[in-house]
Amino acid sequence: MATASVAFKSREDHRKKLELEEARKAGLAPAEVDEDGKEINPHIPEYMSKAPWYLKSEQPSLKHQKNWKIEPEPKKIWYDRGKKIYQAEQYRKGACINCGAMTHSSKACMDRPRKIGAKYTNMNIAADEKIESFELDYDGKRDRWNGYDTSTYRHVVDRYDAKEEARKKYLKEQQLKKLEEKNNNENGDDATSDGEEDLDDLRVDEAKVDESRQMDFAKVEKRVRTTGGGSTGTVRNLRIREDTAKYLLNLDVNSAHYDPKTRSMREDPLPDADPNEKFYLGDNQYRNSGQALEFKQINIHSCEAFDKGHDMHMQAAPSQAELLYKNFKVAKEKLKTQTKDTIMEKYGNAATEGEIPMELLLGQSERQIEYDRAGRIMKGQEVIIPKSKYEEDVHANNHTSVWGSWWKDHQWGYKCCQQTIRNSYCTGSAGIEAAEASIDLMKANIARKEASKESPKKVEEKKMATWGTDIPEDLELNEEALANALKKEDLSRREEKDERKRKYNVNYTNDVTSEEMEAYRMKRVHHEDPMRNFPG
């Protein structure tokens, strides 16, 4: 079947070959064996199992189907850390100036910087490191365990063994302690009730279960109570589903909504039921209980702190945000306590049983204070002078007085130059004179403006007796000028009718005289005049 091409076969040989193949496929005859002694699957098609003629294979085999380009599995090779290859006795040209090794430069030297390098002392020449260069295949480059020393895992095993020993020792001490307490109780009271013994057995069972859970996935044998009457078995993390699903607590369609995708029911399905008898109050009960409320407060605090300019983000750095929130709460409580103590110290506490001091009740004390003629305290309580928030006796920018020595128009300033701008340069008496001159000029401008408002000038409007106005009665016209204006109006009307004769360059003024206006009125056609067509 898996042989190469052979010579011509007779019909009988060909029939026997087909029968043998059918028998091998049916399992009636043993499968063909290759040169390595491995069976060849009889169901492999002939075009796959038959070797090409140029291979000249005499025995059946499937080696021609194997990929001959596949390289053997690469070895787990890695760098020999700290391996040295050659130890020189004298400094060589091109070596490291600091240690004298040829395999690296002085910038990449990992030895301690020497006060005088090996290049100049020619002593204590460091050995050359073993530099390896090998190419890894695709899987070798991505093998995270390549080069891992398995002997280092022994430290992890030792650490876990130590923890296990400490845990067993602690449990043994606790057990001995309980036995001692039990012996002491037996000496005092010999009899114990059956119910207490059952409770002790349950506690022991639960302790065993808790102990087994801490072990690495050990088998847990726990008593299982079933609905059929009680049976025991070996189980692990088994939950008895005897409780009712939350979406079956209330079958009313208009009750609390259940989202099957997220398996959440925010509202209470039984709001009218007794709270003491309910074990489920809706998913909203978890939003304001446990660590959910604290998580919400941390989110609010981080957002407010970020708005105020602090580099704080709950999602980017949750541990930092939680730590800063704890520090903030501690500082807040400390400030609140300090404020409370200050108020108590100043005003007292009316809720206490102690008597209120007489100084607070009567507003006076028995302390004797002596004053001199000027009113200064000579003996007794000294007056505490309030400390200024500004630096005292510091004259900056050529000033001869401090800031706050001048007050005018509800503004502080410098007395030497009477400037109200802080950190300004001193201008001296010239600045004072310039400020007074500007103030005088401003006052003069204000007075002039007020005077102009009180007595405004009457502007006589010049009314023209021409366009759009009635002809005044006292208007006097020159008859000669009026005749010339009439002629000029007739000429302009003729030019309007024949625009070809109009000249390009026109020399005239736009000033309209009274005579020209009168001529325009006389010549124009009054469409609204009912007597315009009446023969005169």
From Swiss-Prot:
Participates in the second catalytic step of pre-mRNA splicing, when the free hydroxyl group of exon I attacks the 3'-splice site to generate spliced mRNA and the excised lariat intron. Splicing factor acting as a negative regulator of seedling photomorphogenesis by antagonizing PHYB signaling to promote light-induced hypocotyl elongation. Prevents the accumulation of functionally spliced RVE8a form, a circadian clock regulator mediating the transcriptional activation of clock genes containing evening elements (EE), but promotes PIF4 expression to fine-tune hypocotyl elongation in the light. The keyword Zinc-finger applies. One of its GO terms (cellular component) is nucleus. Residues 9-25, 488-501 have a biased composition (Basic and acidic residues). The modification Phosphoserine is found at residue 193. Keywords: Metal-binding, mRNA processing, mRNA splicing, Nucleus, Phosphoprotein, Spliceosome, Zinc, Zinc-finger. Residues 187-200 have a biased composition (Acidic residues). One of its GO terms (biological process) is mRNA splicing, via spliceosome. Disruption phenotype: Reduced hypocotyls elongation when grown in continuous white, red, far-red and blue light conditions associated with a depression of PIF4 peak amplitude. Increased accumulation of spliced RVE8a form, but reduced production of spliced RVE8b form. Plants lacking both SMP2 and PHYB have short hypocotyls. Reduced organ size due to lower cell number and reduced fertility. Cell proliferation is arrested precociously in organ primordia. It is found in: Nucleus. One of its GO terms (molecular function) is pre-mRNA 3'-splice site binding. The keyword Zinc applies. The lineage of its organism: Eukaryota, Viridiplantae, Streptophyta, Embryophyta, Tracheophyta. A zinc finger (CCHC-type) spans 96-109. InterPro entries: Slu7_dom, Splicing_factor_SLU7. It comes from the Eukaryota. Coiled coil: none annotated. This is Pre-mRNA-splicing factor SLU7-B.
